[in-house]
């Protein structure tokens, strides 16, 4: 059987990673003040997380990247459905290669029985 770690070790691991990421909130063991120069430096080319939960924008639709907002608001994308476009994706193949192969849509079924 696999050993299940105690809750104390899980809390210690969580506390360690909070300090490594430079969290400003304090906890019972002293918070990030014990490690003043240990925070991961912020790169000037990347957007800053506002609440410490960097993943929140993925779930709640808050776009922090300006180029994504420009793509989503462009007029060429507004007429199409947001799910998928009807044009085939070339994936770097030559145009003549794409013309030779039939385009299969998910709604089409295979009418031949396997032999």
Swiss-Prot record:
Which positions carry Phosphoserine? 9
Q: Where is this region: Disordered?
A: 20-46, 74-115
Span of the secretion signal?
A: none
Q: Does the keyword Phosphoprotein apply?
A: yes
What InterPro entries does this protein's entry cite?
A: PPDPF (IPR026754)
Pfam family name, one: PPDFL
Offer one example of a GO biological process linked to this entry: TOR signaling
Question: In which residue ranges is the amino acid composition biased (Low complexity)?
Answer: 22-32
Q: Which family does it belong to?
A: Belongs to the PPDPF family.
* Chain's role: Probable regulator of exocrine pancreas development.
Name of the protein this chain belongs to: Pancreatic progenitor cell differentiation and proliferation factor
What organism, scientifically named, is this protein from? Rattus norvegicus (Rat)
């Amino acid at each position: 059987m696999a050993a299940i770690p105690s809750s104390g070790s899980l809390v210690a691991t969580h506390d360690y990673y909070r300090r490594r990421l430079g969290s400003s909130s304090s906890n019972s063991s002293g918070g990030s003040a014990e490690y003043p120069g240990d925070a991961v430096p912020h790169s000037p080319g990347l957007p800053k997380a506002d609440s410490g939960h960097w993943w929140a924008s993925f779930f709640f639709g808050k776009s922090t990247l300006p180029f994504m907002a420009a793509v989503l608001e462009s007029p060429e994308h507004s007429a199409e459905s947001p799910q998928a476009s009807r044009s085939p994706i070339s994936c770097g193949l030559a145009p003549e290669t794409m013309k030779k192969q039939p385009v299969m849509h998910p709604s089409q079924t295979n009418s031949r029985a396997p032999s």
